[in-house]
Amino acid sequence: MIRSRTLVLSLAFLLAACAASPSRVPAFVAKPYEPFVRANAIAIATREWRLFGSLIDEASLEGWEAASPLEKPERLPGLWQRVGEYWWLGQNPDEAAGAWTGKHGAGGTVFPFTDDERYAWSAAFISYVMRIAGAGDRFPYSPNHATYVNAAAAGRSSILRAEPPESYAPKLGDLICRGRYRAADLTFRDLPTSYTWPGHCAVVVSDTPGTLDVIGGNVEDAVRLTHVPVTERGTLGNPGEPVLDQRYRWFVVLRVLYDAEAEPARDE
């Protein structure tokens, strides 16, 4: 009788433990301790950029292909694990890609370095920045940029608004986005789409007359900063004309509705 009761209690304990499995994210972001502020998103993106060596997205890298895994920052010691943290912390618990790293796919299998496009982590990076900055459950975390671009364009996000690149000047902490490959010709008028498409988004971290500095993940296999030309009005382009950037066709700005510009002036 005692054994049966002990077994029942043990099973009940195990079931309760499974039901209350720990969240992927730290407590301070699961239920944000501080407001979701612009300054934190910029600081987090900048911190990650410095971790990867403060690399700049140079025009000379266009079309460059690594000859070995050692030429890919995402696969280097200390950095492949960091990419794994972008996946793990940036994705929701039901997303299988949350178990990936900079060189591992499902189950911890190392994928060929020539096949890393299937494991593109730029959206995981943006999701990570937004989550750690304190967006809570308001950001549409996803392994695909199209998810939150479409959510913003369709009015399905409480903290994102899709803005035309020729009329809205991106602010610090906003996201600028472009299509890639088959989606390279997407325009603002195409949004929202009924399908997922390959793309790239980056966080605006600095602005000077004529230039925005943006930080994005998985840019030539690293976190890199890109200099983006803007008009005198601060927009990516002028009405009826292509965007000024001749390298990348940025076609939408995601205005992020932060709770505040910076944390409250208290530290007690």
Regions found by a protein language model. Name each.
Residues 1-8:
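Bacterial N-terminal signal peptides that target proteins for export
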Residues 22-135, 265-268:
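N-terminal capping segments
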Residues 73-74, 95-107, 156-158, 187, ...:
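Surface-exposed intrinsically disordered loops and tails
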Residues 138-220:
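...with weaker cross-activation on analogous glycine-rich loops/strands in unrelated enzymes
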Residues 221-268:
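Low-complexity, Gly/Ser/Thr/Pro-rich intrinsically disordered linker/tail segments
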